């Protein structure tokens, strides 16, 4: 059982993190949209970042609505909000994975024909990749929609004995189909992310070794170190976010209700840090943040 003080502290942290994520999302979309208005073009990475900003904005508002609406009374009145939350979560995973793929294609030094072809076609492919992410996210929530309909049916069958064959069949569908499919929905984009990060890390380490062998300038080596550190941060926080989401879905390791707000504070704290690292990795967003918070020094 979690102490009341810890629960209250977790709720306060969750609300503050939610506000920060909403501000981050609005800033990302506003800055990059202004960039598009000025230059009438955006890079594939910036297109994904705008999509991530919109996704995080919707995800956070949905999360707050669902958490405060159903925590005290876990009735299925908000099941549609829960489905939207899950959809936005899976979409966020796919968009982050696409971002890792873009970084891998753009930065890696592999000379395989597939990488060369992707570098040439990536600008045309990015919209198709976004469409694919939307379709995959929609498909991944189908079992959850069925699951919530099943739970609604179970509420109407309270008059039946607990060991009724109909109730048992409905519960078996939920446990043996819905939950594994949900894990697949989160696992596939994470696997894509993992493969992209591994390939990119291997490429950067090889390139770094070549630069040291040929006695490249210290500034170039420092730049490579900075990229590797950013990559490590990207990997650590997104992996932590994935594992925390998985544990919160399983909910069998601990008393899920008593640890609910602690889990939410941890999850969205990781989201906040991860999104900050993404913003700081983009030159346009980084420049806008510096002008916003350190304008006297930058001028």
Swiss-Prot record:
UniProt keyword Transmembrane, yes or no: yes
Cytoplasmic side: 27-44, 104-125, 205-233, 280-299
Gene Ontology molecular-function annotations: bitter taste receptor activity; G protein-coupled receptor activity; taste receptor activity
Membrane topology, Extracellular segments: 1-5, 66-82, 147-183, 255-258
Membrane-topology annotation of the record: Multi-pass membrane protein
Localization per Swiss-Prot or TrEMBL: Cell membrane
UniProt cross-references to Pfam families, sorted A to Z: TAS2R (PF05296)
Keywords, alphabetical: Cell membrane, G-protein coupled receptor, Glycoprotein, Membrane, Receptor, Sensory transduction, Taste, Transducer, Transmembrane, Transmembrane helix
This protein's record includes keyword Glycoprotein: yes
GO annotation, cellular component aspect: endoplasmic reticulum; external side of plasma membrane; membrane; trans-Golgi network
Segments passing through the bilayer: 6-26, 45-65, 83-103, 126-146, 184-204, 234-254, 259-279
Glycan-bearing residues: 163
Principal subcellular localisation of the protein: membrane
Any Gene Ontology biological process: detection of chemical stimulus involved in sensory perception of bitter taste
Tissues and organs where the protein is expressed, per its UniProt entry: Expressed in subsets of taste receptor cells of the tongue and palate epithelium and exclusively in gustducin-positive cells. Expressed in the antrum and fundus (part of the stomach), duodenum and in gastric endocrine cells.
The protein's assembly and partners: Interacts with RTP3 and RTP4.
Other facts: Several bitter taste receptors are expressed in a single taste receptor cell.
PANTHER family: TASTE RECEPTOR TYPE 2, TASTE RECEPTOR TYPE 2 MEMBER 16
Function: Gustducin-coupled receptor implicated in the perception of bitter compounds in the oral cavity and the gastrointestinal tract. Signals through PLCB2 and the calcium-regulated cation channel TRPM5.
Family membership noted in the UniProt record: Belongs to the G-protein coupled receptor T2R family.
Protein name (database record): Taste receptor type 2 member 16
Organism: Rattus norvegicus
């Amino acid at each position: 059982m979690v102490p009341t003080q810890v629960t209250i502290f977790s709720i306060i942290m969750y609300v503050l993190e939610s506000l920060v994520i909403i501000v981050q999302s609005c800033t990302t979309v506003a800055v990059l949209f202004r960039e598009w208005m000025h230059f009438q073009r955006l890079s594939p990475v910036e297109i994904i970042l705008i999509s991530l900003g919109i996704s995080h904005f919707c995800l956070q508002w949905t999360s707050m609505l669902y958490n405060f609406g159903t925590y005290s009374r876990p009735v299925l009145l908000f099941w549609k909000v829960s489905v939207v939350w899950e959809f936005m979560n899976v979409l966020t995973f796919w968009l982050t994975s696409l971002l890792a793929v873009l970084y891998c294609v753009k930065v890696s030094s592999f000379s395989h024909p597939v990488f060369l072809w992707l570098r040439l076609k990536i600008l045309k492919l990015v919209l198709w990749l976004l469409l694919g992410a939307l379709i995959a996210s929609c498909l991944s929530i189908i079992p959850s929609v069925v699951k919530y309909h099943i739970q609604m049916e179970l509420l109407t069958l309270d008059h039946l004995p607990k060991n009724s064959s109909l109730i048992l069949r409905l519960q078996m569908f939920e446990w043996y189909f819905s939950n594994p499919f949900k894990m697949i929905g989160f696992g596939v984009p994470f696997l894509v992310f993992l493969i992209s990060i591994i390939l990119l890390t291997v490429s950067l380490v090889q390139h770094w070794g070549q630069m040291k062998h040929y006695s490249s300038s210290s500034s170039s080596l420092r730049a490579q170190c900075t990229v590797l550190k950013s990559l490590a941060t990207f990997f650590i926080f997104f992996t932590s976010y994935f594992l925390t989401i998985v544990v919160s879905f399983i909910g069998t390791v601990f008393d899920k209700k008593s640890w609910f707000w602690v889990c939410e504070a941890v999850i969205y704290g990781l989201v906040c840090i991860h999104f900050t690292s993404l913003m700081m990795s983009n030159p346009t967003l980084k420049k806008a943040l510096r002008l916003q918070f350190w304008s006297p020094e930058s001028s």
